[in-house]
Amino acid sequence: MATETLDEKTPEVNSPAKEEIDVVPKEEKEVEKEKVDSPRIGEAEEEKKEDEEEGEAKEGELGEKDKEDDVESEEEEEEEEGSGSKKSSEKETVTPTSERPTRERKKVERFSLSTPMRAPPSKSVSIEKGRGTPLREIPNVAHKLSKRKADDNLMLLHTILFGKKAKAQMVKRNIGQFSGFAWSEKEEEKQRARIKEKIDKCVKEKLIVFCDVLDIPISRSNVKKEELAVKVLEFLESPKETRDVIIADQEKAKKRKSTPKRGKSGESSDTPAKRKRQTKKRDLPSDTEEGKDEGDADSEGTNDPHEEDDAAPEEESDHEKTDTDDEKDEVEVEKPSKKKSSSKKTVEESSGSKGKDKQPSAKGSARSGEKSSKQIAKSTSSPAKKQKVDHVESSKEKSKKQPSKPQAKGSKEKGKATKKGKAKAEPTRKEMLEVVSKILKEVDFNTATLSDILQKLSDHFGVELSHRKPEVKDVITEAINAMTDDEEEDEEEEAEAGSDKEKEEVKGEEEEEKAEAESDKEKEKEEPKD
């Protein structure tokens, strides 16, 4: 309101000043007029007086008005000062008196650099000593912990053991230091019940993982969740070793075994599986030192009940395969003997039947007998020859299929043998052939095996020949083939001799028949004469 009154009164204050400004030029004009118009001085004086009177009256009015304005302005200033002090004190709370709507002022929030509140450092887990051995001192548990990452399973196990979570870096270390629950005697039952509840809340898969980490023996197929929970709780009360077998040593032994096997498979990948198995058998008697090392490794490996050892079934399969190979060799040795006996029997039967069936009937029967004897001789010789050819071809194929690796092994073994003792040189192929032919004449083919002949050869020469087993096999087949050839030649000669005898017998029979016929004719002639 004070501001409005001031604005209204300001033009009244300024108005007399304008009038005064206008008064001065009028007086000057009047003086000039008096000078110009001297005759009109009287009139001018009168007018002047009138003007002066009017001016005085106006000045009086203006003076009064100025005084009133000054008083009002002073009052307004005082009011403004009072209202200004009040407004300054009550700026935020007082609403404006005007009818126009106004928004309330927002409070100014001053920026202040406040130091950030640091989170209190997490208390390190206090690990008390329990009744059992620390988990890091149990070799199998330490080995399995070292191979695992600090995943959710280990974090859960940590919370069960210590009742707190920890950083991923500290989880495995803390679990390794755990040596059992340190319960007070008074609260032992309560604390056991709490931990049992925590373990029961876990899923069966989690409990199986705990058993694996803590090296607790379980059968995964038939185990129930309750049994797993009981076993885990019993172990955690007083941890200790569950078995004597150390997994780390076992894995090292497996690595030793796997490295040479990989080399073998890489070298002889093109060779057939049967030949590989035969080479394994050949290497068994010669590599005694390697066999001992592998045997020790196998003995360590078989102690583990949880992990399946592949060594034992492999050895059994190798033995079975070697037995089958020996049986095959026996069959091959028995075949030529059967051939010999069958050929002899057929020749004897043919000769015997021919000797017995002497009919004094006609020449046709004799000719048919000769033809049949020739056919039998041919038939006996032809299957023997076919079998011989097949046998030679099979031996050639076997020699071709034999991998280059056994030869290399044989050379290595030869080197070992020469290093051990260079007393006797190994026999040549010709020498072996001569001795084998002698042995085959003495040996019974129905019972003899390749290993028996090989043993006799090694005894004869005083040298171990197991690494030359394929070569010995070829030598035996050669000797058998030579023997069968000789026997076939003998049989052919015997057959030819038998056929000559038969021819002579037939001729004698024919002559006898002729003589009998002539004698009969003579008798018939003599009878009518009588």
Curated annotation (Swiss-Prot):
Residues 444-458, 473-477 bind DNA. Its main location: nucleus. Residues 374-384 have a biased composition (Polar residues). It holds the Pfam family DEK_C. Residues 426-481 form the DEK-C domain. It is found in: Nucleus; Nucleus, Nucleolus. Keywords: Chromatin regulator, Coiled coil, DNA-binding, Nucleus, Transcription, Transcription regulation. InterPro entries: DEK, DEK_C. Residues 1-47, 57-68, 83-93, 100-110, 387-397, 516-530 have a biased composition (Basic and acidic residues). Residues 41-61, 185-205, 492-527 form a coiled coil. Residues 253-263 have a biased composition (Basic residues). The keyword ATP-binding does not apply. A motif (Nuclear localization signal 1) lies at residues 260-267. One of its GO terms (biological process) is regulation of DNA-templated transcription. GO terms for molecular function: chromatin binding; DNA binding; histone binding. Residues 69-82, 286-332, 484-497 have a biased composition (Acidic residues). A motif (Nuclear localization signal 2) lies at residues 343-350. It comes from the Eukaryota. GO terms for cellular component: nucleolus; nucleus. Residues 1-130, 246-430, 482-530 are annotated as: Disordered. PANTHER family: DEK DOMAIN-CONTAINING CHROMATIN-ASSOCIATED PROTEIN 2, DEK PROTEIN. This is DEK domain-containing chromatin-associated protein 2. It comes from Arabidopsis thaliana (Mouse-ear cress).
